[in-house]
Design a protein with these regions (language model features):
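Single, function-defining residue in the core of a domain
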Residues: 1-55, 63, 71-72, 76-84, ...
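Short Lys/Arg-enriched helix C-cap and helix-to-coil transition segments
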Residues: 88-99
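Intrinsically disordered, low-complexity basic tails/linkers immediately adjacent to helix-turn-helix/homeobox/MYB/SANT
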Residues: 97-110
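Extracytosolic and intramembrane catalytic regions of membrane-associated proteins
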Residues: 133
Length: 292
């Protein structure tokens, strides 16, 4: 175990050094930023960010610099932080993860990749419309980001993340984007009812992935309610849907399912006269005494 910890730690240090050796790619003004010698240089800044927990920034700085009397001020740190692009940490996450992604644990040869999202409360700022979310139960203003993530369930590691602001928050779009940019093969995508979406199904199929996504029951207003399903309490059937953007007598007689123009489906542009065939399996089974 100690060898593995040292290996992972050394890998992280190497990727931080690689990042620090090419800072111009991740600075707002590469010709000026971090050009002067400061106690918080680019590599030190990355180290502070990676080591920070939930304490105040002044406490984090004191911890990082071992309570040195010449510890840089919060203002100095904030000035350096303003120079760095978010892409620096995206690069570090992806390069480090790709280098340390385990391949040993799988389910019948497949990676189990779970997708979910969560709100992250950040510092209150009434002047930031992109992150202004809502008023909380106490009537206070709340600013949030939304974190979308892919998590390798059996290997217990995040494989991708996508952060959205309140203004552009869309879990369907985030999931489809992470599917498209993934390099992983032999994947079973696992998600809850929040990801019940034909566009996600199609992206997974086009990627060559399998998926197991929970959907609302057939008596609700979800996808299952619009399908011709057996009356049985339990069933396991294959479904094929042919989608069309056109809602004409011809398409209706052909049995095509109309895809409204306000519904995002990347494989059928809004004015397309083509069709798209989507096949999947739907299973209904009990998960409680009176629920399926």
């Amino acid at each position: 175990m100690s060898n593995y910890i040292n290996q992972v730690s050394d890998s992280l240090k190497n990727h931080i050094s690689e990042l620090a050796n090419n800072p111009c790619l991740f600075l707002r003004n590469p010709n000026v930023n971090f050009s002067r010698k400061r106690k918080i240089d680019f590599k030190t800044f990355i180290g502070i960010m990676m080591n920070s927990g939930g304490a105040t920034m002044s406490k984090e700085l004191l911890d990082f610099f071992d309570f040195d009397k010449n510890t840089p001020s919060v203002s100095a740190f904030t000035q350096q932080r303003s120079k760095v692009l978010p892409e620096a940490f995206e690069y570090l996450f992806k390069s480090f993860t790709d280098d340390n992604l385990p391949t040993t644990n799988n389910y019948h040869g497949y990676r189990l990749i779970a997708c979910d999202g969560s709100n992250l409360t950040i510092a209150t700022n009434q002047k930031d419309p992109e992150t202004f979310w809502e008023r909380n139960q106490h009537g206070s203003i709340v600013n949030k980001l939304h974190l979308n993530a892919f998590y390798d369930v059996l290997n217990r590691i995040y494989t991708d993340v996508l952060v959205q602001t309140a203004a552009d928050y869309n879990e369907f779009r985030a999931c489809a984007t992470m599917i498209d940019r993934s390099k992983l093969e032999n994947v079973i995508l696992v998600a809850d009812r929040g990801y019940e979406n034909y566009n996600i199904f199609a992206h997974a199929i086009e990627k060559g992935w399998k998926f197991a996504i929970r959907v609302k029951d057939k008596n609700s207003n979800g996808i299952a309610s619009g399908l011709n399903l057996p009356p049985n309490d339990e069933f396991d059937i294959d479904i094929t849907q042919i989608f069309s953007r056109e809602n004409t007598k011809t398409t209706k007689n052909a049995g095509y399912k109309w895809m409204p123009v306000n519904q995002v489906f990347d494989y059928l542009p809004r004015k397309s006269d083509k069709t798209y065939e989507l096949s999947f399996r739907i299973i209904r089974f009990p998960i409680g005494s009176n629920s399926y």
